[in-house]
Amino acid sequence: MKQLTILGSTGSIGCSTLDVVHHNPDSFRVIALVAGKNVARMAEQCLEFSPRYAVMDDTSSAEQLKIMLQQHGSRTEVLSGQQAACEMAALDEVGHVMAAIVGAAGLLPTLAAIRAGKTILLANKESLVTCGRLFMDEVKRSNARLLPVDSEHNAIFQSLPQSIQHNLGYADLEQNGVTSILLTGSGGPFRETPMCDLAAMTPDQACRHPNWSMGRKISVDSATMMNKGLEYIEARWLFNASARQMEVLIHPQSVIHSMVRYQDGSVLAQLGEPDMRTPIAHTMAWPNRVTSGAQPLDFCKLSALTFSAPDYQRYPCLKLAMEAFEQGQAATTALNAANEITVAAFLAQQIRFTDIAGLNLAVLERMDLHEPASVDDVLQVDAIAREVARKQVIRLSR
């Protein structure tokens, strides 16, 4: 039985992970749950899965949780703060850590899991977007293992030969017969919206993804295709891919989750319903397979599968992310931080949808980008970029 810590248990990925546990009670045991401030959901999870530990972001949330659990006779030990989260990621009895805390807050707990030599089920994009080389070097040093949870990276992983799967981030694609990686994306809810109408799009419209059920922040990132840009950066690190070895495709149906092109002309793809439980279950059980709870793909009900090249005028955030990778980790860190601030401002209706890309670019242009040598350096770049972004939002929204 595999013992799990789930970082970000009350979020979308965390809840889907627990659903996979629910479907496979003899295969997985939850040792620790870590979350932010959603006390009610954490209480429900603790009562159903009886973890040994539960960690909340702050003491107030932890106290509320403690009272709720005591009323139900739960023996789960309640802790709070980032240090406790890092300790849960490194517990001796835990072999697998689901890293699903969104944003820069997930960096240190994920790093703690890596340094403890765990198998990390990586759903936190920011870990590689901001700390790609630092994290990949630490994985090798600590003999940890990364298994990608993002549906696209998981699809690529499944389509690659074992020689690359067992040496992620370092294997030479060309020497293993791989020509390129094809990263697919739906194009989001505004794929066919006239360009002249994009400025008027509301947060609710941006969050109506045609295929996936996701949180509001990542839904906006899908609409701008910043999500695909961050996935591009992540794929470059995970699969040791050059710009020449990467292709980005718009695939509106979200049935093919990504592909790998081989030197002999073959293209291997992973298909499935757009349900995150599929890649989650794959990483949890790898190299075996378990029931995910997802519906099987019905080929007889599929419409045509279509593909097109991305329009960078419609999706400037995608181009911005691809260019940031070439500038280095300081640029990708600053872009990610700026984007979190600008998306939050859009969701709060402080700026327009079309302001997001321009503000992100403005932050990059105002930053003095020195390559970070440590996670502390990354966090400093992150903090400065957030402050610059906040000032840009205030200036624009006056």
Curated annotation (Swiss-Prot):
UniProt-annotated binding residues for NADPH: T10, G11, S12, I13, G36, K37, N38, N124, E126, G215
Domain of life from the UniProt record: Bacteria
Residues reported to bind 1-deoxy-D-xylulose 5-phosphate: K125, S151, E152, S186, H209, S222, N227, K228, E231
Keywords: Isoprene biosynthesis, Manganese, Metal-binding, NADP, Oxidoreductase
Enzyme class name: oxidoreductase
Catalytic activity: 2-C-methyl-D-erythritol 4-phosphate + NADP(+) = 1-deoxy-D-xylulose 5-phosphate + NADPH + H(+)
InterPro entries reported in the protein's UniProt record: DXP_reductoisomerase, DXP_reductoisomerase_C, DXP_reductoisomerase_N, DXPR_C, DXPR_C_sf, NAD(P)-bd_dom_sf
GO biological process assignments: isopentenyl diphosphate biosynthetic process, methylerythritol 4-phosphate pathway involved in terpenoid biosynthetic process
Sequence positions that bind Mn(2+): D150, E152, E231
Record-level Gene Ontology MF annotations: 1-deoxy-D-xylulose-5-phosphate reductoisomerase activity; manganese ion binding; NADPH binding
Pathway assignment: Isoprenoid biosynthesis; isopentenyl diphosphate biosynthesis via DXP pathway; isopentenyl diphosphate from 1-deoxy-D-xylulose 5-phosphate: step 1/6
Pfam family, one: DXP_redisom_C
Cofactor: Mg(2+); Mn(2+)
SUPFAM superfamilies named among the record's database cross-references: 1-deoxy-D-xylulose-5-phosphate reductoisomerase, C-terminal domain (SSF69055), Glyceraldehyde-3-phosphate dehydrogenase-like, C-terminal domain (SSF55347), NAD(P)-binding Rossmann-fold domains (SSF51735)
EC number, UniProt record: 1.1.1.267
The keyword Manganese appears for this protein: yes
Function according to Swiss-Prot or TrEMBL: Catalyzes the NADPH-dependent rearrangement and reduction of 1-deoxy-D-xylulose-5-phosphate (DXP) to 2-C-methyl-D-erythritol 4-phosphate (MEP).
Family per similarity comment: Belongs to the DXR family.
Subunit comment: Homodimer.
Protein name: 1-deoxy-D-xylulose 5-phosphate reductoisomerase
Gene symbol of the encoding locus: dxr
